[in-house]
């Protein structure tokens, strides 16, 4: 009887075990927006091959172009403010129905011509300055995902480099002109229109650079 209980307990416990599944990284294949046109192959030259007079520049959906990212940005701003204000007011009743001659009134209020005398002043000085400089250099290959009616190319590229469980991810999106592509099939990032360039990290080092959730809550709630 005891053996049956032990076997039944083991069966129940095995049902509570959660199998660890391997995390699969997302595929880097971009969805092509425009399908490649179908050409009829000839007996000598294939439609998928480069023409006799064509160069190696990207021009079709699915072609690869190398983006040389050289982004530099800097900005600075300085402001100063100074304000001041002062005011003074005085009021009195030197003559009021002859009461100023009464000794009772004058003894209680001293001088009716100086019943009220007040002054106020305020001053504010403020200054601030900010400066920022950013530099990003990288080289990444992107894929042509669409060819616009004016022959401009929409590109998208992503590169993920993992070192010691730390991922460095570079992504580039935008629109380029075929004429800006060099003979080496490269293009500088300054010629990418509507450019979306990002460089981010994922891993324990990136997590340690962020404040904890409790500190974020306190920063939002702290009124001073």
From Swiss-Prot:
Lipidation residue positions, type N-palmitoyl cysteine: 16
Oligomer and partners: The basal body constitutes a major portion of the flagellar organelle and consists of four rings (L,P,S, and M) mounted on a central rod.
The membrane topology term of the UniProt record is: Lipid-anchor
Kindly report the protein's main subcellular placement as a broad class.
membrane
Q: What is this protein called?
A: Flagellar L-ring protein
**GO cellular component annotations, sorted alphabetically?**
bacterial-type flagellum basal body, distal rod, L ring; cell outer membrane
Specify whether Electron transport is a keyword of the entry.
Answer: no
Keywords in UniProt for this one?
Bacterial flagellum, Cell outer membrane, Lipoprotein, Membrane, Palmitate, Signal
Q: Which residues form the signal peptide?
A: 1-15
Per the similarity annotation, which family is this? Belongs to the FlgH family.
